[in-house]
């Protein structure tokens, strides 16, 4: 190997694993769910990785044990910041995600509202019609300025995530997933993986028990 080629090879290795190319492919401890733009300019700066269902999903978790304010958990995109601010026994959903070690990685967290929406858009489990009052997401890549249509997004092509698949999100009556984004002092945002409903305008009361699925970020 020439010196120039060897330098290129070493540089490639220093920047980590090859970038993911297919939604749902195994990647960095979980599965590739899409890109996010923390600046909201359609330029992706992180790959979003959803945790394996068997080790990174929890059920019957409260957002908080009381319906009171969480001033550090208001961002629609900063899941790591939201989640870290709630890493205690008063916040079972965030604490579950923050405590995970999967694939040697310890930086799992409860996704923010716009992060979990990307998971729904790219990894939609069912063929059920979408709601048309949710879907705007400035942090998606590309950004989406309009709500869903009945048929968009469609069911994912990632077979492990469709109904009955080993990685599929839970669907069915009242099967919401918590985000780490507070909607009001007493409520937090959720996502319903049957239809994409984010339960506007402010979500569900924090004391409710719903599902959680951890994610992590990998810099682009």
Please give the residue ranges for each predicted region.
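C-terminal, surface-exposed recognition/capping segments
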Residues: 90, 113-220
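Extracellular adhesion/carbohydrate-recognition regions
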Residues: 12-108, 175, 186-189, 200, ...
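Short, intrinsically disordered N-terminal pre-domain segments
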Residues: 1-15, 219-220
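Compositionally biased, low-complexity segments enriched in small residues
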Residues: 7, 64, 70, 78, ...
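Compositionally biased regions
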Residues: 3, 15, 67, 84, ...
């Amino acid at each position: 190997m020439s010196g120039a080629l060897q330098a290129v090879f070493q540089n490639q290795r220093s920047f980590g694993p090859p970038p993911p190319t297919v939604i749902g492919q195994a990647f960095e401890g979980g599965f590739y769910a899409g890109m996010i733009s923390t600046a909201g300019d359609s330029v992706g700066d992180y790959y979003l990785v959803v945790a394996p269902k068997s080790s990174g999903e929890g059920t019957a978790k409260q957002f908080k044990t009381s319906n009171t304010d969480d001033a550090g958990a208001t961002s629609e995109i900063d899941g790591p910041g939201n989640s870290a601010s709630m890493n205690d026994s008063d916040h079972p959903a965030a604490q579950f995600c923050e405590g995970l070690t999967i694939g040697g990685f310890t930086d799992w967290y409860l996704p923010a509202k716009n992060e979990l929406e990307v998971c729904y858009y790219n990894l939609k489990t069912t063929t059920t019609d979408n709601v048309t009052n949710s879907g705007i997401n400035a942090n998606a890549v590309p950004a989406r300025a309009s709500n869903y249509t009945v048929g968009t997004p469609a069911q994912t092509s990632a077979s492990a995530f469709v109904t009955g698949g080993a990685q599929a999100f839970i669907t069915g009556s009242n099967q919401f997933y918590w985000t780490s984004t507070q909607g009001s002092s007493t409520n937090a945002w959720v996502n319903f993986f049957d239809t994409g409903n984010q339960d506007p305008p402010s979500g569900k009361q924090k004391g409710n028990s719903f599902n959680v699925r951890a994610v992590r970020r990998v810099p682009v």
